[in-house]
């Protein structure tokens, strides 16, 4: 059975993330899986930094104390994870009528997540993580790395979520975007929503083929042509029409590189007030 993987922690995005994952599960009939990765650092993490400046005897005593502390720390972290999973599960069941399954892992969030994700999953991640929220960062440290490294479609969610009725599909003529167009036409998640097919560039005729294809597939499509900066146009169009979801297929190689590593990603992630769906 295909899955929605909700990557949960105690960030301010958690309730919106749960609602978004539940919406996807309802739209697609997928299993809803809550993924919680315990990536805390043990008490002995910095021991190597001080071992060279203390004597052997005191170091041995410190190791014993740290071992006892780490055991307690591990138990507390596991209790925290169990309570968080239970709370979110109960909330999703009460508000959306969906039973969830759980995956708990320990270690680095990105490493553990990438081992779990499958190509046909849809992963949902909050724009803010626990540490980012504490430091008042606009984007979680793991978000861009997660999108870049995940082998499946990823939705990013902020602190609010409303079930979308319309979405923007930012299109450029490329093999990957053509593949994405076909996936949208077949998608249980997107095909019932109004598609705003947005092209930013100097060749408006590029939209003729995807417009015809999506219309023939039964989608309600609104074509739109813009010129200028990619990120600025996507954000402006979304705000003008109050569209609730931005779907980003892949652009050509140079634009993918710029999107994930450059100013386009930063601008969109920091300024978008609606979820982003990045399709692989």
Residue spans for each PLM region:
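Structural alpha-helical scaffold elements that stabilize or flank donor/cofactor-binding regions
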Residues: 115-117, 146, 160, 239, ...
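Glycine-rich, Arg-bearing micro-motifs that act as flexible, cationic patches
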Residues: 10, 104-109, 125-145, 248-271
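Short beta-strand elements of ligand-binding domains
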Residues: 124-127, 150-159, 277-280
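Small/aliphatic-rich secondary-structure junction motif
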Residues: 2-66, 162-225
């Amino acid at each position: 059975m295909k899955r929605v993987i909700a990557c949960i922690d105690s960030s301010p995005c958690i309730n919106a993330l749960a609602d978004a994952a539940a919406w996807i599960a309802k739209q697609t009939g997928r299993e809803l899986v809550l993924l919680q990765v315990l990536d805390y650092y043990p008490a002995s993490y910095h021991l190597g930094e001080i071992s060279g400046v203390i004597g052997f005897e005191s170091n041995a005593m410190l190791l014993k104390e740290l071992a006892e502390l780490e055991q307690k720390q591990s138990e507390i972290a596991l209790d925290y994870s169990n309570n968080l999973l239970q709370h979110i599960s109960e909330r999703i069941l009460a508000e959306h009528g969906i039973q969830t399954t759980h995956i708990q892992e320990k270690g680095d969030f990105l490493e553990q997540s990438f081992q779990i994700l499958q190509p046909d999953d849809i992963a949902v991640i909050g724009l803010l993580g626990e540490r980012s929220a504490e430091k008042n960062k606009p984007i979680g440290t793991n978000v861009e790395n997660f999108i870049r490294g995940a082998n499946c479609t990823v939705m990013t969610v902020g602190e609010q979520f409303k079930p979308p009725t319309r979405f923007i599909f930012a299109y450029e003529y490329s093999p990957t975007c053509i593949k994405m167009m076909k996936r949208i036409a077949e998608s249980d998640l997107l095909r019932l929503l109004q598609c705003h097919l947005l092209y930013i560039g100097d060749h408006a005729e590029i939209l003729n083929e995807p417009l015809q294809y999506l219309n023939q597939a039964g989608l309600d499509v609104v074509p739109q042509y813009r010129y200028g900066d990619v990120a600025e146009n996507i954000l402006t169009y979304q705000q003008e029409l109050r569209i609730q979801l931005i779907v980003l297929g892949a652009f050509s190689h140079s634009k993918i590189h710029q999107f994930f590593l450059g100013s386009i990603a930063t601008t969109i992630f920091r300024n978008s007030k609606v979820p982003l769906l990045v399709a692989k």
